[in-house]
Regions:
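Membrane-interacting alpha-helical segments
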Residues: 1, 5-8, 12-19
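Alpha-helical scaffold segments in soluble metabolic enzymes
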Residues: 10, 188, 234
């Protein structure tokens, strides 16, 4: 199934390129930065800090990871990727001194590899529901730790994924852990995959998760340190 996805994604490259230029003409895409969607950047990765990559597609998803940015930006380089110009504008307006922002590369193996070769993240955190199979699988192949935070799956998407549940499990088994934002999301995800799924609550709607946020950030520090130790032992 995944091989078919890869083939189809390559077939669609001409349409993706054409659509990108159309979006530029309509001012829906950033003319000066559209190459980032193809894994190309003008920015150099800082050499003195390990990098945490957080993917938050939209502004709403971006707000869910505010506590991660504030907890980690001093010690780690924080790379935020989004897919919309609105989210990019929001990120640069509110967090320009704390993060590096890039547009997420299109989910084509060639462009994903370019992106990963440049940034070499230590940890990747996916926010909510914007999952890209090629990217996620490439992270697994490179043994880069990934977490799915504030995870959700709508009833409509759940019905669609039920027909491809084995593929959903193939994708999500790349995650070290999944944290669902509601009990309904938890049950839907558990129906589709055997990956470790925990109930968290919606980080955008409540501040009652302060204890989780504290323990979660500490767990991330431990995971990064553990990954570093494993690399040294190799």
């Amino acid at each position: 199934m995944h091989r078919l996805y890869i083939i189809i994604s390559y077939i669609l490259i001409p349409l993706i390129v054409i659509n990108t230029y159309i979006r530029i003409l309509k001012k829906k895409e950033d003319k000066s930065r559209y190459r980032e969607r193809f894994g190309i950047t003008k920015i150099q990765k800082p050499k003195n800090k390990e990098l945490i990559w957080i993917h938050a597609s939209s502004v709403g998803e971006f707000k869910s990871c505010d506590f991660l940015i504030n907890n980690f930006y001093e010690k780690y380089c924080i790379l935020i990727t989004t897919t919309t110009k609105t989210a990019s504008d929001y990120a640069l307006k509110n967090y320009s001194k704390k993060i590096i922002h890039q547009y997420a590369p299109y989910d084509i193996v060639l462009w994903v590899n370019k992106f990963l070769d440049i940034w070499k993240p230590k940890l990747v955190i996916w926010i909510e529901s914007d999952l890209w199979p090629n990217t996620i699988v490439k992270l697994r192949e490179r043994k880069i730790l990934s977490i799915f935070l504030n995870a959700r799956i709508s009833p409509k998407s759940f019905i669609k994924w039920k027909y491809f549940s084995s593929y959903y499990e193939f994708i999500t088994k790349s995650f070290f852990a999944i944290y669902a934002q509601s009990e309904n999301d938890l049950n839907r995800i558990k129906t589709l995959t055997n990956v470790n799924v925990n109930f968290l609550g919606n980080l955008k709607l409540t501040k009652k998760n302060s204890s989780f946020k504290s323990s979660f950030t500490e767990n991330i520090r431990i995971m990064i340190a553990s990954t570093h130790q494993n690399e040294e032992s190799l």
